[in-house]
């Protein structure tokens, strides 16, 4: 699991911690950090302003640029990018900057002095598979109000640090950044602050949900109308990049971000592409279907399917169907949050060779069903904020068992399992730091499993 410290800092203050020391503390509590490092690679990167750009006299593709890299400080840089032009704010690697491709130095390029390099996003060491095509094709042009001389990675929000955490099977809950935040808060002696989720007036829903297989223990669907498809905010795009997920658009990005934040996979359907406005979760299909990646797959009777209009709306927990996908013209959507059987999904995902981020959450048991309704509300709130959603409908869902589970354990059992000599107060302090609800009678703890 890739954990962004910038994202973690949204829930618990960690930006005053040395990342290496924080990684050691997290490892000591049983969450092994297997790798770590900065999100983007590069030192001495600043925001520059291209004051002048002319053609290189000895080249048919190079340009000679006069670039202001600090107030009143102009340097000449030779650049071969086709989209460089006067008046642009750009990312400049100063001499001495170390990028993945090597160290930048001053020198002569076809007889003209060049003191630095104007960069693309791709040259900053980000995973090329997660970048947009325009970020690979030429230099990255910054907004006009980008302050000249500012540290570029900080300005872009890419000065992040990533922990690669190897989660054992019993800690699948930490696939949710909010759960990881509680662990970090406990080890640092701090409090977690979760985002406030705004509730909106709701109209009676126009959709139906029917579950016809025991392999789906919960299914919730929420209709939201009036959305606009556009770019998601930069902070959200950066959070997804840091989590190893490619940003697509605000609708898709919100669904992926909510999964990263809460651990609950989200799928969205274009409501206007549905005829019957009903979702039937069942098995028994034996046909071919084109999914979101535009490839055709064999659907077998044992596969759990979210059926729409008697067809394949989604291979449950794995990938959505192509017929109901979100596109640039989408105005009305249905949000799905569900709990599917992990073993059944594992067989389907492996056969299709589609071990997606969503399927991994189901397979590893990261789903907290009791939080599913809250997750739908979180998703809705983000759609209002960043997709201009106008009309919200009631959530339609199958019965939800909200009985909280409890675990009873004696202090002697705790110490016997851990090989420790903890006192009642020490164990109580640990439960308090993790925000666990519990009762204590003599040395017997009854702990309510968190949700």
Describe the role of every protein-language-model region:
Residues 1-198, 334, 350-355, 366-369, ...:
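Phosphate-backbone binding interfaces of nucleic-acid-interacting proteins
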Residues 5, 24, 63, 188, ...:
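Glycine/proline-enriched, intrinsically flexible loops and inter-domain linkers
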Residues 40-46, 197-205, 254-261, 274-275, ...:
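A glycine-rich phosphate-binding loop feature that marks nucleotide/adenosyl-phosphate handling sites
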Residues 184-213, 387-414, 418-421:
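Terminal amphipathic helices with adjacent charged low-complexity linkers/tails
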Residues 47-76, 255-323:
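Conserved mixed alpha/beta core segments that line enzyme active sites in large multi-domain catalysts
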Residues 122-123, 129, 141-142, 229, ...:
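Conserved catalytic alpha/beta cores of large enzymes that bind or transform nucleotide phosphates
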Residues 399-451:
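Noncatalytic alpha-helical scaffolds and linker/capping helices
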Residues 19, 33-39, 191-200, 247-252, ...:
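Flexible, glycine/charged-enriched surface loops at secondary-structure junctions
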């Amino acid at each position: 699991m890739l954990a962004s410290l910038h994202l973690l800092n949204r829930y618990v203050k960690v930006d005053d911690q040395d990342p290496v020391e924080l990684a050691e503390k997290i490892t000591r509590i049983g969450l092994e950090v297997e790798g770590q490092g900065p999100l983007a690679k590069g030192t001495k990167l600043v925001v520059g302003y291209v004051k002048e750009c002319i053609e290189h006299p000895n080249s048919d593709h190079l340009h000679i640029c006069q670039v202001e890299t600090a107030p009143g400080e102009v340097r000449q840089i030779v650049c071969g990018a086709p989209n460089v032009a006067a008046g642009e704010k750009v990312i400049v690697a100063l001499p001495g900057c170390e990028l993945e491709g090597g160290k930048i130095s001053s020198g002569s390029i076809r007889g003209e002095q060049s003191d630095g390099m104007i960069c693309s996003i791709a040259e900053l060491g980000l995973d090329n598979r997660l970048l947009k095509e325009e970020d690979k094709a030429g230099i990255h042009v910054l907004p006009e109000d980008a302050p000249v001389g500012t540290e570029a990675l900080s300005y872009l929000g890419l000065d992040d640090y990533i922990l690669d955490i190897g989660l054992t099977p019993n800690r699948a809950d930490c696939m949710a950044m909010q759960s990881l935040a509680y662990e970090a808060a406990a080890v640092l002696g701090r409090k977690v602050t979760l985002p406030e989720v705004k509730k909106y007036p709701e109209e009676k829903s126009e959709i139906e949900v029917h579950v016809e297989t025991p392999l789906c223990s919960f299914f919730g669907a929420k209709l939201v109308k009036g959305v606009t498809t556009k770019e998601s905010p930069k902070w959200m795009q950066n959070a997804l990049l840091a989590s190893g997920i490619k940003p697509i658009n605000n609708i898709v990005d919100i669904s992926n971000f909510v999964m990263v934040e809460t651990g609950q996979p989200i799928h969205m359907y274009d409501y206007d592409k549905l005829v019957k406005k009903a979702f039937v979760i069942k098995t028994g299909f034996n046909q071919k279907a084109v999914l979101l990646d535009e490839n055709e797959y064999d659907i077998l009777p044992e596969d759990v399917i979210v059926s729409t209009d008697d067809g394949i709306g989604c291979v449950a927990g794995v990938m959505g169907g192509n017929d109901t996908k979100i596109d640039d013209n989408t105005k009305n959507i249905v949000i799905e949050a569900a709990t599917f059987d992990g073993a059944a999904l594992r067989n389907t995902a492996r056969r299709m060779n589609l071990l997606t981020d969503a399927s991994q959450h189901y397979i590893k048991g990261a789903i907290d069903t009791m939080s599913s309704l809250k997750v739908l509300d979180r998703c809705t709130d983000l759609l209002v904020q960043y997709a201009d959603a106008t009309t919200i409908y009631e959530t339609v869902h199958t019965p939800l068992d909200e009985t909280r589970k409890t675990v009873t354990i004696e202090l002697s059992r705790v110490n016997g399992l851990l090989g420790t000599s903890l006192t009642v107060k020490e164990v109580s302090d640990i439960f308090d730091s993790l925000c666990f609800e519990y009762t204590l009678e003599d040395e017997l703890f009854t702990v309510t499993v968190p949700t």
